[in-house]
């Protein structure tokens, strides 16, 4: 039975879809059968990050409305064995998702995959509750800024109140991914520290992604950064291994200038 992992955030633009794409590839390359599902109706971009935008014929709404069957809508990634992708609808009504139809879809996917990664709409946009409803695990992506942390705190509360596991008295395994960390700014007191982020959100940390220009370059090429050898790629690889239950040594990010590290004892 598949594990449903919802990747979510309190606001848009924090790297949620990029994280979904890279972790999907990481899990697939670890030998797991993975499907990445884009639930961000009207604002899809997971397809572009995966480099699959030109292969979309049917989308998740087409499946729910029975315009096609599930196998017709699933796109297999030719570059990554074991990875499939189901696109969000680009032009249909954001409110088109239906609780019963979503449940049918997720149950069908559970039968065929080891991991279902759901790219959730940000915050409490339409479709968010559908994206978190079936989550076994939730990865909350934040950036070290006040607005991101405030909105993510609200999202965590909704997961704890409205997911199926929460309603049945079980826990959704929630973890924090801190994205776009700039150690120099932390050292100078210009960016919220890792300690403060963890204190505010009270979630276990599963990884830190450093600010990295390679991510922009890779995204523009439709080549997820995890396939490269840069620091952000290594960070995504470590997160992947932790999702799989491995005990992975944590890495300390240091400021490039000077001897002071604002992250001493804090890990990625």
UniProtKB/Swiss-Prot annotation:
Name of the protein this chain belongs to: Septum site-determining protein MinD
Signal sequence segment: none
Cellular component, GO annotation: cytoplasmic side of plasma membrane; cytosol
Residue positions binding ATP: 11-18
Coiled-coil ranges from the UniProt annotation: none
Subunit structure, interactors included: Interacts with MinC and FtsZ.
Protein task: ATPase required for the correct placement of the division site. Cell division inhibitors MinC and MinD act in concert to form an inhibitor capable of blocking formation of the polar Z ring septums. Rapidly oscillates between the poles of the cell to destabilize FtsZ filaments that have formed before they mature into polar Z rings.
Localization per record: Cell membrane
Entry membrane topology: Peripheral membrane protein
Pfam families: AAA_31
NCBIfam families, alphabetized: minD_bact (TIGR01968)
Family from the record: Belongs to the ParA family. MinD subfamily.
């Amino acid at each position: 039975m598949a594990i449903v992992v919802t990747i979510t955030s309190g606001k848009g633009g924090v790297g949620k879809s990029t994280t979904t794409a890279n972790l999907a590839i990481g899990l697939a390359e670890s030998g797991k059968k993975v499907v990445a599902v884009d639930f961000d109706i009207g604002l899809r971009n997971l397809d572009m990050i995966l480099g699959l935008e030109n292969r979309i014929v049917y989308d998740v709404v087409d499946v729910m409305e029975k315009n096609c069957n599930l196998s017709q809508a699933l796109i297999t990634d030719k570059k990554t064995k074991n990875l499939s992708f189901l696109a969000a609808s680009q032009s249909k009504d954001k409110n088109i998702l239906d609780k019963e139809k979503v449940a049918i879809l997720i149950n069908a996917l559970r039968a065929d995959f080891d991991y279902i990664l759901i790219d959730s709409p940000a915050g409490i946009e339409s479709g968010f509750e559908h994206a978190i409803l079936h989550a076994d695990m939730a990865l909350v992506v934040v950036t070290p800024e006040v607005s991101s942390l405030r909105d993510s705190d609200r999202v965590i509360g909704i997961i704890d109140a409205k997911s199926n596991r929460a309603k049945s008295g079980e826990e959704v395994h929630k973890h924090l991914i801190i994205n776009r960390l700039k150690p120099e700014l932390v050292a100078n007191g210009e960016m919220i520290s890792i300690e403060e982020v963890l204190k505010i959100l009270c979630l276990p940390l599963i990884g830190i992604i450093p600010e990295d220009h390679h991510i922009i370059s890779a995204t523009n090429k439709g080549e997820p950064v995890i396939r490269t050898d840069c620091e952000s790629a290594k960070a995504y690889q470590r997160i992947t291994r932790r999702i799989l239950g491995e005990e992975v040594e944590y890495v300390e990010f240091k400021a490039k200038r000077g001897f002071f590290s604002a992250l001493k004892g804090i890990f990625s």
